[in-house]
UniProtKB/Swiss-Prot annotation:
Gene Ontology BP annotations: tRNA 5'-leader removal
GO cellular component: ribonuclease P complex
Protein name listed in UniProt: Ribonuclease P protein component
Catalysed reactions listed for this entry: Endonucleolytic cleavage of RNA, removing 5'-extranucleotides from tRNA precursor
Top enzyme category: hydrolase
Subunit structure comment from the entry: Consists of a catalytic RNA component (M1 or rnpB) and a protein subunit.
Protein family membership: Belongs to the RnpA family.
Length: 113
């Protein structure tokens, strides 16, 4: 996923947190903020320190990023997303990460078929 598809700045994260809608399952929390003037979606990924050491957190972020890249054609394009991983994600395989992320994105009504 290219860097132009990422939410990076603290102010942008806070805007999505405060003004966006949230949806969650046991593995992920997703905040979504619609931005009609935006050409493509952007994603911010947050993995807290409760999830292992730095190696484990980076592993989880890579898995989430890869899953989102594979789901890219189905995602709503005019939104900013924040994906927050919960501690159970550290023990999941790539297929499970993608499946649970797909589930929470469907709940948030941002994933088409």
């Amino acid at each position: 996923m290219r860097k132009s598809y990422r939410v990076k700045k603290e102010a942008e994260f806070q805007t999505v947190f405060t003004q966006g809608q949230s949806c969650a399952n046991r593995q992920f929390v997703v905040y979504m903020l619609e931005k009609p003037d935006q050409k493509h979606f952007r994603v911010g990924i947050s993995v807290g320190k409760k999830i292992g050491n730095a190696v484990a957190r980076n592993w989880v972020k890579r898995r989430i990023r890869q899953s989102l890249t594979e789901l890219k054609p189905q995602l709503k394009q005019d939104c900013d997303f924040l994906v927050i991983a919960r501690p159970t994600v550290a023990y999941m395989s790539m297929a499970e990460v993608k499946e649970h992320l797909k589930h929470v994105l469907k709940l948030a009504k941002v994933l088409g078929e």
